[in-house]
Amino acid sequence: MRHSCLDAFNSYVARYDASDERIALKVEHTYEVAELCDEIARGEGLPPADVDLAWLCGLLHDIGRFEQLCQWGTFSDADSCSHAALGIQVLKDEMGSFTNDPEWVHIIESAVALHSDFRLPAGLSDREGLFCTITRDADKVDILRVFNQSSCDAVLGIDSSEFSRGEISDMAFEAFGERRCLARDERPGSLDGLVGAVCLAFELELPATRKALGDRGYLQALLREPFGLSPHFESELTQYRWNAICDVMQGLAFDSRPGIESEDPHKRLMNRLDCSEAELNSEAYVDGGIFLDSLLERYDA
């Protein structure tokens, strides 16, 4: 089954400009997410047929990206259309090349349609929710891979000197304290995209996903040396905030000890600081309107 699906996927992608690096990056992302879906499904103890279905959800989750790039020249949904919705349109013509099983078609369409939503909607069946969650979890893990393998300029739109002068906004730091992903309008600071990537780990829902991320070391590497740079910042407030973020993540990420999940994350975070933020001279934050532009171009993260 997988060989025929890979052949169908590669035949579909061959219609687009293979010399465009963005196509190659999206193909790589697709393969990575599909394999992560397989790994997560196996780790959660799903039967072989469901593991194959999870893998296929991963293979097709970004099928709309190629036509999006062809029509609009961008991977940014804000500057074109919803790539998830476009993927559903593509699959109306292409789904038969991958499966004709009505139940599989329904699950795949749900996973594709909802993989990039900020939250899953109420009303999904348990089975729909499971495959949507596997797909979303796998996508988040691979976004962290992208952060590890990309430059600061490519991801945040700032060079290394600007990185050292960067700011973490109140809004992003508060979202981190709440242990949740950042919405697109919660990223005004030049380093908020980096904080947003770290926050992806908070919303990995399945134990097998957290294990997959831990095994790959993407988060640890990002905390230790983001974009291959030393995380030393000119702003004292930024440095305190980054140190607090690192300390909390090292203490909480993938920690299964009883009581960890119930601890107030903001209290824990603030307890990590050597002094309160009120004692620091908080200046105006950098307007980071261009931060993450390149990442949005690739993944609309």
Task: Describe every region a protein language model picked out.
Residues 6-32, 65-77:
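Active-site flanking loop/helix segments enriched in acidic
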Residues 45-56, 96-113, 127-134:
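Acidic/histidine metal-binding catalytic segments
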Residues 70-85, 153-157:
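Post-HEXXH active-site segment of zinc metalloproteases
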Residues 21-27, 31, 35, 39-47, ...:
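Divalent metal-dependent phosphate-bond-processing catalytic cores, especially two-metal-ion Mg2+/Mn2+ enzymes
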Residues 23, 73-81, 94, 98-102:
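Short gly/ser-rich anion-binding loops that grip negatively charged ligand groups
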Residues 32-40, 81-95:
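An active-site-proximal "capping" alpha-helix that borders the catalytic cofactor pocket
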Residues 29, 52, 79-83, 130:
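Secondary-structure capping and boundary motifs in well-ordered enzyme cores
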Residues 51-76, 87, 107-118, 301:
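His-Asp-centered metal-binding catalytic motifs of divalent-metal-dependent phosphohydrolases/nucleases
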